[in-house]
From Swiss-Prot:
One of its GO terms (biological process) is regulation of DNA-templated transcription. Belongs to the TALE/KNOX homeobox family. This is Homeobox protein HD-12. Its main location: nucleus. Pfam families: Homeobox_KN. Keywords: DNA-binding, Homeobox, Nucleus. GO terms for cellular component: nucleus. It comes from Encephalitozoon cuniculi (strain GB-M1). One of its GO terms (molecular function) is DNA binding. Residues 123-185 bind DNA. The lineage of its organism: Eukaryota, Fungi, Fungi incertae sedis, Microsporidia, Unikaryonidae. The keyword DNA-binding applies. The gene is HD-12. SUPFAM superfamilies: Homeodomain-like.
Length: 193
C-alpha cells in the first residue's frame, strides 16, 4: 500500500512538472485503483486501513489541485477571448479614424486639368507632402540614426503608431529620405574634429 502512495505522489509531481500528460496520469490512477481493489479483496484483517486513508487524502488533495488548474485555465481562456474582442474593437475604431483622416483635406489629392487638345479631360495628380508634424517626427528619427538609417520592424511599427502612417508609407518615406535628405543631414551634422 505504501507503494501506491509513493506512485500517486510521484505521478502528481510529474504532472505538475509537465513530465506526463492527462492521459498518462489517468492510466497511472486506474492502475493504482485496480491494485487497491485487488489488495482490498485479499486483505481480510484490514491492516492497511491507515494506508488506504492516506491514499484517499492524497488523491482528494490532488483532485482539488486538478480542479483548481482547470478553473485557472478556463479563466485565462475567457480573459484571452475578452482581450481579443477588445483588440478587435480598438482595431475597428482605428481603421475608421484612419479612413476619416485619409478623407480629410490633409491627404486629399488635387486634380488639375491640363489645357489643350486631347489632354483637356485628363487629370494630373499632384504629389502630396505629409503634414509638418509627421515629417518632423520622421526627420528626428533619421537625425538620431544617421549612421544606420534603416528602422527595424519594431521601430517602424512605433513610428507608424506615432504618425498615423501605414508601414508602407513609412518604408517609402525612409527610402526617399535616404536619397534626398540624408546626404544633406550628414554634411550638416558630421563632426569635424
Amino acid at each position: 500500500m505504501m507503494r501506491h502512495i509513493n506512485e500517486i505522489l510521484i505521478a502528481k509531481e510529474k504532472y505538475f512538472q509537465s513530465s506526463i500528460n492527462d492521459h498518462d496520469l489517468k492510466e497511472i490512477i486506474l492502475k493504482i485503483q485496480q491494485d487497491c481493489i485487488t489488495y482490498h479483496s485479499t486483505d481480510l484483517l484490514g491492516s492497511s486501513l491507515l494506508h488506504k486513508l492516506i491514499l484517499i487524502l492524497i488523491i482528494e488533495k490532488f483532485k482539488s489541485l486538478l480542479l483548481f488548474e482547470k478553473n485557472i485555465i478556463s479563466i485565462f481562456d475567457l480573459e484571452c477571448v475578452n482581450f481579443q474582442e477588445e483588440m478587435n474593437s480598438i482595431m475597428y475604431v482605428m481603421n475608421e479614424v484612419e479612413k476619416q483622416y485619409l478623407r480629410s483635406d490633409k491627404f486629399s489629392t488635387h486634380n488639375h486639368s491640363l489645357t489643350g487638345g486631347l489632354f483637356a479631360s485628363n487629370s494630373v495628380i499632384r504629389r502630396i507632402n505629409f503634414p509638418k508634424e509627421i515629417s518632423k517626427i520622421l526627420r528626428k528619427w533619421l537625425k538620431k540614426h544617421l549612421t544606420y538609417p534603416y528602422p527595424s520592424k519594431i521601430e517602424k511599427k512605433m513610428l507608424s503608431k506615432e504618425t498615423g502612417l501605414k508601414l508602407s508609407q513609412i518604408d517609402n518615406w525612409f527610402a526617399n529620405a535616404r536619397r534626398r535628405i540624408l546626404p544633406f543631414m550628414k554634411e550638416k551634422f558630421i563632426d569635424f574634429d
